[in-house]
Structure formats: C-alpha cells, structure tokens
Amino acid sequence: MKGDKPEEPGPGPEPSGPPPPTEEEEALLEFHRSYRELFEFFCNNTTIHGAIRLVCSQHNRMKTVFWAVLWLCTFGMMYWQFGQLFGEYFSYPVSLNINLNSDKLVFPAVSICTLNPYRYKEIQEELEELDRITEQTLFDLYKYNSSKTLVAHARSRRDLREPLPHPLQRLPVPAPPHAARGVRRAGSSMRDNNPQVNRKDWKIGFQLCNQNKSDCFYQTYSSGVDAVREWYRFHYINILSRRRQDTSPSLEEDVLGKFIFTCRFNQDSCNEANYSHFHHPMYGNCYTFNDKNSSNLWMSSMPGVNNGLSLTLRTEQNDFIPLLSTVTGARVMVHERDEPAFMDDAGFNLRPGVETSISMSKEAVDRLGGDYGDCTKNGSEVPVENLYNTKYTQQVCIHSCFQESMIKECGCAYIFYPRPDGVEFCDYRKHNSWGYCYYKLQDAFSSDRLGCFTKCRKPCSVTIYKLSASYSQWPSATSQDWVFQMLSRQNNYTIKNKRDGVAKLNIFFKELNYKSNSESPSVTMVTLLSNLGSQWSLWFGSSVLSVVEMAELIIDLLVITFLMLLRRFRSRYWSPGRGGKGTQEVASTPAASLPSSFCPHPAFFSSSPPDPAISPALSAPPPAYATLGPHPAPSGLAEASTSAHAPGEP
C-alpha cells in the first residue's frame, strides 16, 4: 500500500540469465531436413496454380499421379512456348514502317553525256592506225567497203606505222554430229541468239596471251558487230590511256554551249555555278547539274513540268566515232548529290527529235544493321578502299573492289575506274598482257569469284528516285522552222539535220509527297518479356513472384543436396572410429571433449569420506560403451580380481 516501506529483498539465489534458445525457435538461416519436407512446404505455400493438388490428394495415389503428370505436361508446354519465343527473338525479325511525308524536296543531281567519245579532231592521229586495220578487217570478213568514209580519206593521207597487236580473226567452230546439232543450239552457252553473217558456223575474236606466251585464249563473239566493237574498244582504251596520263587542257575542257543550247530550273536560267564537268571514256563530255559542289542548292516547292530542270540538247553525230559509238542522242542519269554518276549502270538514252519528260517520285529507305540486317552505315567496316572519295554506295564499293583486284593481278588500273596514286592506266605498250589478265578477271568478277558482291554490303540509308518517262515529237512540224531559227541565231551554230540535231529533256517531281520505308525490330526485349509473362500466366496463372518461388525451390534443392553429400562424406571419411567398424567411437573420444556435467567432481578424488547425501550414481561418470563388450584385461588387474573373489565363487 501507499506509504508502506518497500520490502527489502531477502537473501536468496541470484537471478539467472536468459534461458538458452530451444530447438523449436527459428534460426536466422535454416533449411529443410529432407526433400519430402521441402516439397510439401513448397506445394502448401506456393502461388503457382495446381501445385497444392499434389499434396491435398496424397491419400489418393491415382489423383496424385494425375496431377503430377498434368503439372509436368503443363510445365513442359510452357517451356516449349518459351523456346519458340526465344527463337523468334534471336532470329531478329524486322517490321517495315511506311510513312507518307509532304515537304519541299531537294532536287537530285542530274548527269547528262553527249554519247560522243572524244572527237576526231582531238585524237585523229592516234585513231588512224586503228581505223585502217578495222577497215581492212571489215572488208576481209564482211566485204564492207568504206571508201566513202572519213577513214578512207585519212588512209590516203599517209602511210601508217606497224600493225596493231591482237588482230581480229575469224575462227571456225567444229561442226557437231547432225543428230546433236539441234541439241547444241538449244543448250549451248554460246551467244547463238545474236545475228550471224551468212549463218556460217564460225566465231569472230582476237587472241590474248599471258606475259611469257605460255597460256593463250581467244576472246570470241558469235556476232560480228559485237566482236568489232569490242576489239575496237579494247584498242581505243589503250590509246585513251596514253592520253589520259598526259592530258592537254583542250581535251579536258569543253564549252557547255556546244552541247546544251538552253538550260532552265524553276523558270530561271542556269549558270556555270550550277554544273560540273567530267569525261567518260565511252560517253565523252558529261555535265552534272546540282551536285555537291554547286554553289546553289536546288529546291522544289511545286510539282510539275514547269518547276524542274529543262534542257535543250544538241545531238548531231557528224563528228562521232562510228566504230565505237553506234547510237545517237544523249545519256542521262538521276542520282543523289553526293554520289558519283555511273552512266553504264543506271543511265538511259534520249532520242533525237523527241521531247522526253521524266517525272520523279522520291522514296527513302532506312534499314537496320547489326544483328537485324547485312548493311553498313558509312562503309567503314567494309574491307574495300573507296577510290571515289565520295559517299559510300554499293556500286562505289563494287567498282573499287574490281579496280583493287585489277591492280593486284594485272599491275595496272582499268581506265573506267579511278586509280590510286602512283598507278598507271593499262596500256599494252607498257603492260603487254593486261588484256589477257583483264578478261580473265572480268569473268571471275561476273561469277563473283572475286568476292566483291559479298564484301560490298548495302548501305543502311538509301534515297531512290523512281522515274517514269513520256515522249512526244519535238519540235512539231508547224513550229520547227522558227524554233531551229532561234536556236541557230542564239548559239551561233547551224543545225544541219534539224530533226536529228536536237532533243529536249524535262525532269521534275510529279508530286511533293515522298514515301519513307524504315525498319524497326519486330520483337524487342520488352515484347519478349511481355510474351513470356503471358505464357507463364496462361499455363500457371502466376506472376513474377512465382518465378522467384521457383528459383527459391531450386536453390533449396541444391543446398539440401550439398548438405546431405557433405554429411555422408564426413561420416565416411572423418569418423574417429572408422578403423574398428564404429565400435570405438565413444571409447576413443578424449575426456576433454566430454561435457562438464559428465566429469567427476573434484571432491570425488579427495581423502575425506564421501558425502552420503550424494548418490554415487549421480557423481560417477558414465561408463564407456566400449567397455561393456568383452575384451581381455591386463594381467595385473586379472590377478587382483582373482584374489579378491571368495573361495568357491565362480
């Protein structure tokens, strides 16, 4: 009560410490004692559907087996679907996205060539010998008399030097048996579809040999026209190679007005800042409008024929090389501003006396590289040097690859492609076997044995201009007189053959809408995880935490297996009584390892009599189990034991 003095604690036993933890209390880290216990715990507590049925039906073996089989089949189906999803992801599929855009468009570059290789007056002396031998060859093979041509006039001027190497020849082909003749023509690799003179069974060609003349072959053609043109072209390249290495300014420069009478873009006249000049070995003088070096960037803000490039061209052929160029007109190509013009690959010809209107539509393609596609962004990883020093394109790479092979195998550069510094163009006066090497290399290139088409990958970003052309006669019969009169007075030039002397070209956008095609990954990591989660929920109706439970089960299985193996290993190899089949296990335990409660009290060994209140059974240590078994005693102890027995006792 209040006011009472607190009771003083009397003498008594001292308070003991906190009780030691019992086995039932949960430890910080513990594991199940058996697989069965672990499995029952997992099935009773997991959130995966169907697992608890394996425990609830344990008293009905048939249901247990049914649910176990169903659970395993469901598990297998789910992981089969997982394999399908991972296979789809690692195949790196792409989706094509098509967008339609509308904006002002940058006008592309337009390259146009005369279709007229270097004129007679520029390289007349170099071509006389070639023309004479070609004339004689045509007469021998086809009885063609060109006495009225310019070549005949040149031949009467002076005697020429030694004959050219690699003469053109007529080569007979052995006739097959009559029964197999139809089969040969049907399945032969020869160019039997080409026209043949008098239907003779021969071929036209010229012989090419290697450096030491140990290997030779004939470059042959079933068409005489093709053979003559190719043979003339081969020698023309040699002549041109000598001039290209020592080019005079008069040969490289040409007046724009000699080829292009009028030029307008968006109704404004062109000037010298809008074009650049280059030479093509076969197409002569070429001009590129609106290339990357132009000072003014041409833009199209309106579609239609009046909002593009309009050119009036001179297409007369009075000074053409007839044995090299068999067509008249002009050649045009549309390409990107920072790409070179490959007139052989993508150009097309314009017809004289015709107005050609070309409408364009732009299309941009953006591909995915890396694992999603075999394309390159800038060609830096392509093992081919860009000899054009321009933007990477597949054609740039392919031509550079062939030129590298040409320099490596033949020791000289092909005149149609750029050459590295310090390398000469091929000329049989310096490289007498380059023709043999070139045609062999060309055959390997066509069949991709050089690997150029494999090395040169597509660019990831490409701009394509789709062209559609329409044609009409120009000028008309009623207007041609005043048109030709104006052109002649304006350009101080007399057009001899009016209809075949001019051509008109219009290039424009037919619409400002352009299509962009871009690739994107069809299956991203987010999509993959979503699909995996959907499959997991479909087959087990669980979530990510259920996956963690499965991982925990696997870890527990591994730990329990490890502990069981460790226990078995210790019992087999670390047991102290291992030598006596386990009978010496307790007997061999040292006294120091026994608990203190099993050790005798120190007073037990004192000289004073023992306290009768203390039971000997409680104070004595437990006997060693090994001593309970029979084994011989020491001799001294045996005698003492015998003397202690009373007489007559057993």
Swiss-Prot record:
It is a multi-pass membrane protein. Originally identified and characterized by its inhibition by the diuretic drug amiloride. Residues 9-21, 614-624 have a biased composition (Pro residues). Expressed in kidney and lung (at protein level). The record marks 158-159, 184-185 as: Cleavage by Furin. Keywords: Cell membrane, Cell projection, Cilium, Cytoplasm, Cytoplasmic vesicle, Disulfide bond, Flagellum, Glycoprotein, Ion channel, Ion transport, Membrane, Sodium, Sodium channel, Sodium transport, Transmembrane, Transmembrane helix, Transport, Ubl conjugation. Coiled coil: none annotated. A motif (PY motif) lies at residues 621-625. Ubiquitinated. Can be ubiquitinated at multiple sites and undergo monoubiquitination and polyubiquitination. Ubiquitination by NEDD4 or NEDD4L inhibits the ENaC channel through endocytosis, intracellular retention and degradation of its individual subunits. Residues 155-223 are annotated as: Gating release of inhibition by proteolysis (GRIP). Its main location: membrane. Disulfide bonds join 113-286, 209-216, 263-270, 375-460, 397-437, 397-456, 401-452, 410-437, 410-460, 412-426. GO terms for biological process: cellular response to acidic pH; cellular response to aldosterone; intracellular sodium ion homeostasis; multicellular organismal-level water homeostasis; sodium ion homeostasis; sodium ion import across plasma membrane; sodium ion transmembrane transport. It comes from the Eukaryota. The keyword Glycoprotein applies. GO terms for molecular function: ligand-gated sodium channel activity; WW domain binding. It is found in: Apical cell membrane; Cell projection, Cilium; Cytoplasmic granule; Cytoplasm. Residues 87-543 are extracellular. Heterotrimer; containing an alpha/SCNN1A, a beta/SCNN1B and a gamma/SCNN1G subunit. Interacts with WWP1 (via WW domains). Interacts with WWP2 (via WW domains); inhibits the channel. Interacts with BPIFA1; the interaction is indirect via SCNN1B and inhibits the proteolytic processing of SCNN1A and SCNN1G and the activation of ENaC. Interacts with the full-length immature form of PCSK9 (pro-PCSK9). This is one of the three pore-forming subunits of the heterotrimeric epithelial sodium channel (ENaC), a critical regulator of sodium balance and fluid homeostasis. ENaC operates in epithelial tissues, where it mediates the electrodiffusion of sodium ions from extracellular fluid through the apical membrane of cells, with water following osmotically. It plays a key role in maintaining sodium homeostasis through electrogenic sodium reabsorption in the kidneys. Additionally, ENaC is essential for airway surface liquid homeostasis, which is crucial for proper mucus clearance. This is Epithelial sodium channel subunit alpha.
